[in-house]
Amino acid sequence: MAVSAKYDEFNHWWATEGDWVEEPNYRRNGMSGVQCVERNGKKLYVKRMTHHLFHSVRYPFGRPTIVREVAVIKELERAGVIVPKIVFGEAVKIEGEWRALLVTEDMAGFISIADWYAQHAVSPYSDEVRQAMLKAVALAFKKMHSINRQHGCCYVRHIYVKTEGNAEAGFLDLEKSRRRLRRDKAINHDFRQLEKYLEPIPKADWEQVKAYYYAM
């Protein structure tokens, strides 16, 4: 993308207004927030960040976390993991301040696994549907961990499922994801983190997810 075109598109999305789904959070001299907008009949999510950086040996002075998240989403997509489709993802430095944007399409038909269980409590799904959903969650984890990548922020609100038609599962909010040298480290981190705040997933259902996972 040419520099001028990149800046033009960045400025276009930066100026876009919508409803806040994650109110601006100001900390460490930076800001982060997510708005929902409509474009050409599609629901999009615009994540904005200023001065949210990660540091590494390669980037000792820091790089925007959105740059890393974009790379992670693309890597997981190549591995067959269901993740939000990227419309735009860039970071620019303006007058010494990093600004970063990630625009993604809504995961149409998917709901968080927490919302799925809330619906299940009101209008129970069949055991066949529930088992298909649990197996889909196991498969999503298996694909992610197969490339030694851990989610890094593994909570029920970040696991999305769809049970209309073929059951599917995927992930969002991947800015803290990282690659581990050993696969078991990624598995243990994600599973232990999720198990600390497992509700509303019943423990028996989670044990079934792990049974499917280790049988794959």
UniProtKB/Swiss-Prot annotation:
Induction: By several factors in addition of internal pH. Signal peptide: none annotated. GO terms for cellular component: plasma membrane. Pfam families: Kdo (PF06293). It comes from the Bacteria. Belongs to the protein kinase superfamily. KdkA/RfaP family. May be an environmental sensor responsive to several stimuli, including internal pH, proton motive force, temperature, and possibly other unknown factors. This is Protein InaA. The gene is inaA.
